[in-house]
Structures are given as C-alpha cells and as structure tokens.
Amino acid sequence: MKVAEQSALLVQYARFSYTHSMSNYKFFDHTADIGVEVYGRTRKELFMNTAGALFDVMIEHKAGRATAKRQKKITVEGTDVADLLINFLRELLHLFNGEHFITGSCEIIEFSNKKLQARLTGESFNNKKHSIKTEIKAVTYSGATVKRVESGWKARIIFDV
C-alpha cells in the first residue's frame, strides 16, 4: 500500500485518544485563559484533533488509557465552520460537566459546514482513575478561527479557565 493510501485510511478512521499527539496542537499565550492552535489534514481531522486537545488539557489518567465503556451519538449545528467547532467542543464539555462523560475516542460520521454527527466512546469520570488537570469553564468565541492552510486546516480556540 502506498503512503498516500495509508494516510487516507488513517484520516478516514482517525480517532483521538488521551495519548493524543501534541504535534497536532500547540498552546499560545492568552491572558488568564488557554489558547490552543490545532492542525488537521482535513476539516474532519481538525475537529477530532481539537476535541483531543480539549481532553488532553482537562484530564490526567492515573491508571493508563481510558477504557471504552459507554457510547454516545451527538449532532451539532453551527452557522459556519468556526461556530460548528465551538458548538462541538461545547457539547463535549457539557457532557463532561453534566454527565461526567470523558470522551476517549470520537468518530465523525457526518460532516458539513453547518452540521456534524459524531459517535463518542468513553467512560465516566472516576477519582481513582482520573484527575482534573485544568478546569475548563467554557469554550469561547473570542478569537476563534478555522482556516485552510498549506498543510490542511488550522483552528485557534480559547478555553476559559
């Protein structure tokens, strides 16, 4: 199989996990909050990498990787791609804050500029297995961008802490 074909398969089946590579995102300075710049070869990969960054910032696993015990299907809408990304991340944060659901993997099964549907696999927060690294209060619109770049796509997001 050629490298391009392997890459296409990886993107098609891409999921994020808590061993998510920090090479897909980096932090930028922002007063009193956390700024994250995230990259993806496709918009779908960008969204999954951004979700991975959210949970990498929030959760520390004391006992290894997340064990997939629960599944959820979510549908999110937005007025444009940036709004869709913010709403997607807000839904993940809502599931964590409201149901203590830690998303361990994410498969985006439907995606357009204004709507996405994703299948989430994860587990409930457990003090014996997890700790909170950083409490994120909200995903903000302040400075949020999603744009095409030479290597694919880039987003800048600010997490209110």
Which role fits each region the language model picked out?
Residues 23-40, 44, 49-161:
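N-terminal intrinsically disordered, cationic/polar leader segments
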Residues 2-11:
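Extreme N-terminal basic, low-complexity initiation segments
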